[in-house]
Amino acid sequence: MSLDYENDGDLHARLIDEVLSQYPDKTAKRRKKHLGVAKGREALEQGSDALCETGVKSNIKSIPGVMTVRGCAYAGSKGVVWGPIKDMVHISHGPVGCGHYSWSQRRNYYVGLTGVDAFVTMQFTSDFQEKDIVFGGDKKL
């Protein structure tokens, strides 16, 4: 790429449409909000301060049940709180999928003999679902 690069907005818009055409309609509609063509030099020279019309979407809530790049509060807190503790078994009170996702993160690298002084490879979960947490899940314990 050089400094005299020309921004072909029409080409980029067609490429975005081509990518979105591979998704089902509902998914394409949601993803379209996150894709946009950068404005050319002319728009910046005319005083436009935004480089793209789409804006930042990282501060909106995730859709429950959908894996995102950002992860979730559960996986983040598990990694921060339990990540450094390698010499005890962790019991996770949450869904199996959440437990596995948070268990498989890179902060689970460890040094030690599994089952003796390191229990990182073991993932125990009560498989609590939302209804168990709201209405009491003591029978599952």
UniProtKB/Swiss-Prot annotation:
EC class name: oxidoreductase
Cofactor note: Binds 1 [8Fe-7S] cluster per heterodimer. Binds 1 [7Fe-Mo-9S-C-homocitryl] cluster per subunit.
Enzyme Commission number: 1.18.6.1
Transferase as UniProt keyword: no
Molecular-function GO terms, alphabetical: ATP binding; iron-sulfur cluster binding; metal ion binding; nitrogenase activity
Swiss-Prot/TrEMBL catalytic activity: N2 + 8 reduced [2Fe-2S]-[ferredoxin] + 16 ATP + 16 H2O = H2 + 8 oxidized [2Fe-2S]-[ferredoxin] + 2 NH4(+) + 16 ADP + 16 phosphate + 6 H(+)
Biological process annotations from GO: nitrogen fixation
Functional description taken from the UniProt entry: This molybdenum-iron protein is part of the nitrogenase complex that catalyzes the key enzymatic reactions in nitrogen fixation.
Name of the protein in question: Nitrogenase molybdenum-iron protein alpha chain
Provenance organism: Rhizobium leguminosarum bv. trifolii
Lineage: Bacteria, Pseudomonadati, Pseudomonadota, Alphaproteobacteria, Hyphomicrobiales
